[in-house]
From Swiss-Prot:
Reactions listed under catalytic activity: indole-3-pyruvate + NADPH + O2 + H(+) = (indol-3-yl)acetate + CO2 + NADP(+) + H2O
UniProt-recorded name of the protein: Indole-3-pyruvate monooxygenase YUCCA2
Knockout or disruption consequences: No visible phenotype, due to the redundancy with the other members of the YUCCA family.
SUPFAM superfamilies: FAD/NAD(P)-binding domain
Gene, per the UniProt record: YUC2
Superkingdom per UniProt: Eukaryota
Amino acid sequence: MEFVTETLGKRIHDPYVEETRCLMIPGPIIVGSGPSGLATAACLKSRDIPSLILERSTCIASLWQHKTYDRLRLHLPKDFCELPLMPFPSSYPTYPTKQQFVQYLESYAEHFDLKPVFNQTVEEAKFDRRCGLWRVRTTGGKKDETMEYVSRWLVVATGENAEEVMPEIDGIPDFGGPILHTSSYKSGEIFSEKKILVVGCGNSGMEVCLDLCNFNALPSLVVRDSVHVLPQEMLGISTFGISTSLLKWFPVHVVDRFLLRMSRLVLGDTDRLGLVRPKLGPLERKIKCGKTPVLDVGTLAKIRSGHIKVYPELKRVMHYSAEFVDGRVDNFDAIILATGYKSNVPMWLKGVNMFSEKDGFPHKPFPNGWKGESGLYAVGFTKLGLLGAAIDAKKIAEDIEVQRHFLPLARPQHC
């Protein structure tokens, strides 16, 4: 490490470094303190490997704490959502609430003594081939200062949901009512007796419509593409659990056939409700296209009863109305965009080919997308939710432990 220290020391005369505080980190740098980042740090900690977690927000799991609606629960049973090395409390229900999940994450961080550095926005991260180290430049802190953190390893844990997707819709600037993304939606209370257009029919869009109904609003759902809707449970067992068990014994297309037949028995023909099923089965579509099936928590019953209207693709928006591709026009008081999130990795990770510039996901799909070159790792990009993040977090910690036997960890130092 003497060569590394010497190389870094020479950079003190560079104009860029003169304005930047620089700190050498002995263990990995983890960008993001959501469940993926916390899981990776905990797995490293269990192997006596320190890490530094950088977080742009003011708290852990900021998406869960600040950008989710009040009625949210985990859509999968808690057994499939726990992070490594620490189960959920036995007192928690099968499907924990948002508040319970946040409390679990806070307890997890406390248990493993994980202390992220908050208010640190990563502006750029790149590999310095001269010294074989990662340089991560951030801005933030109390004085909004620029910092550079240096390490042999970089773990990208910003995940699939770093930035809101804001669709381009003709006429949106002309709409007279409020327009908000689901990241700003908390409950339907303020929309009581109002006609609301919800754009997007994923799990969030479907559940927001249900929440609006519960507050006596009048929601309409825009369904642009085909979608698989499955019951949350079949025969008293979670649909996800059944799928996982069956996949151990049967190929995907056989399990898909079973899921579709059971869904028709439980939910009926969703095509008649305007929710046309894709040609690919739900699991095959998830694997090939990354499209997650919707787990129904009561929305279909509201659609059948007429409390939720279903419209096809949105053509354009006018002052207080919207026109759809089938020619229908209806009036609305507000628009809620349930259009999801996207990765922001290409915005700040430079000079690597591990991630796609198009969607910000690793080029290699699960289970091979967790490891790149030169000490670069990714966690939380499996499209398998918390379960996938836990799997990759364990692999990353194991891999770094092997490497540290060949080159001991450095001591923290200014560079």
